[in-house]
């Protein structure tokens, strides 16, 4: 795992590949105030229950540009943000998840968390796997994002109590899924 703790700021330089497998596997993580990961031209692949491509929590932050994330497993989210004060800036990237409840971007009850998404694809294939899931009072801003779901009851945007702004094109199949649930 590519990880930042205790005010660390690891940065990828050049083409980088991060692969991990097993329950709770992580591709990249930032945890704690001042901890930040910077990913450019990076491929992340995780396999396993509760795996995450990028995991940011407890005031950590991540900058990701021109990356690809591919997760496989139940609740294996592409980008996971937890605890208030955390921040993720994602641009020019692609997220693909395969698994039940494996969301593209999940902001888990993190009041004050900020996620900025620009020119990015988030595609999910599992049942109950929303492209963007934010059940709490968080904020997500989109700029030309494409959100696609293919599983049963998988919303493009599931934003209960959250704020979502910007341009996003959600498409959902089958008919049991919806573009936006607020």
For the regions a language model picked out, list residue spans one by one.
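Predominantly extracellular/luminal carbohydrate-interaction, adhesion, and secreted-enzyme modules
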Residues: 1-6, 26-32, 52-58, 77-82, ...
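Beta-strand-rich solenoid/repeat architectures in extracellular/passenger domains
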Residues: 8-24, 36-50, 60-75, 87-101, ...
């Amino acid at each position: 795992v590519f990880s930042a703790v205790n005010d660390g700021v690891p940065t990828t330089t050049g083409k980088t590949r991060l692969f991990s497998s097993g329950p709770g596997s992580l591709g990249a993580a930032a945890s704690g105030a001042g901890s930040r990961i910077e990913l450019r031209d990076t491929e992340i692949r995780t396999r396993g229950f509760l795996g995450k491509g990028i995991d940011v929590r407890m005031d950590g932050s991540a900058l990701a540009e021109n990356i690809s994330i591919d997760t496989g497993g139940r609740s294996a989210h592409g980008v996971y943000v937890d605890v208030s004060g955390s921040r993720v800036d994602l641009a020019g990237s692609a997220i693909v998840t395969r698994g039940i409840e494996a969301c593209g971007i999940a902001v888990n009850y993190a009041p004050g968390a900020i996620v900025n998404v620009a020119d990015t694809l988030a595609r999910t294939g599992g049942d109950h796997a929303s492209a963007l899931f934010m059940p709490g009072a968080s904020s997500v801003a989109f700029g030309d994002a494409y959100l696609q779901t293919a599983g049963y009851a998988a919303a493009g945007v599931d934003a209960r109590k959250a704020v979502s702004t910007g341009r996003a094109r959600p498409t959902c199949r089958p008919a049991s899924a919806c573009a936006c649930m607020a």
